[in-house]
Amino acid sequence: MMIESSSQDVASLVIALRQQQVIAYPTEAVFGLGCNPDSESAVQALLALKQRPWQKGLILVAAHYAQLKEYIDDDALDDAARSRIFASWPGPVTWVIPVCPTTPSWLTGQHASLAVRVSAFEPVRRLCLAFGKPLVSTSANLTGQPPARSADEVRGQLGAAFLVLDEAVEGRLNPTEIRDALSGELIRQG
């Protein structure tokens, strides 16, 4: 089911998230698949839909830094790392940050870190604010296929078993840049 972006429709997406369902929504460059990061069953459903191995880990996208603090080890960040991160947020840069001991492996995969982003893109911010926490965010496509850039492309690749927020992506040509928070090293060009 495709839905427009009224407050009622955002409420429908939040209900789906609270019911451990997968949703699709526009991001800065492509459509994302998202779910409740605290629900192992929701994350497993997302990984199965995308045909993505759990070992790779996932990205969390948030409306503000405070939404990420229960998942990452904030104390691992020195002043230089904080400066790099906060100079780019909110915005289209994803940072890989060490995690708290309680962060579940269904988010981190085989890593001791987690990729996180505070988005400036309004549809993502609205969803995260309405949900009250970050969302798992991974490109809406089958592993190995091109990412979907429209709601119709999401349906074409992944079917119609979940809600899709039918809005345009922000328009960036490339996925978000990914950097290591501790070193500043570029992991994926944006």
Curated annotation (Swiss-Prot):
Keywords: ATP-binding, Cytoplasm, Nucleotide-binding, Nucleotidyltransferase, Transferase, tRNA processing
Disulfide topology: none
GO molecular function terms listed in the Swiss-Prot or TrEMBL record: ATP binding; double-stranded RNA binding; L-threonylcarbamoyladenylate synthase; tRNA binding
Boundaries of every YrdC-like domain copy: 7-190
GO cellular component: cytoplasm
UniProt-listed GO biological process terms: regulation of translational fidelity; tRNA threonylcarbamoyladenosine modification
Localisation: Cytoplasm
Domain of life: Bacteria
Catalytic activity entry: L-threonine + hydrogencarbonate + ATP = L-threonylcarbamoyladenylate + diphosphate + H2O
Presence of keyword Magnesium: no
Pfam families: Sua5_yciO_yrdC
EC number: 2.7.7.87
Family: Belongs to the SUA5 family. TsaC subfamily.
Protein purpose: Required for the formation of a threonylcarbamoyl group on adenosine at position 37 (t(6)A37) in tRNAs that read codons beginning with adenine. Catalyzes the conversion of L-threonine, HCO(3)(-)/CO(2) and ATP to give threonylcarbamoyl-AMP (TC-AMP) as the acyladenylate intermediate, with the release of diphosphate.
PANTHER family per UniProt: SUA5, THREONYLCARBAMOYL-AMP SYNTHASE
Protein name (Swiss-Prot/TrEMBL): Threonylcarbamoyl-AMP synthase
Species this protein is from: Sodalis glossinidius (strain morsitans)
Gene that specifies this protein: tsaC
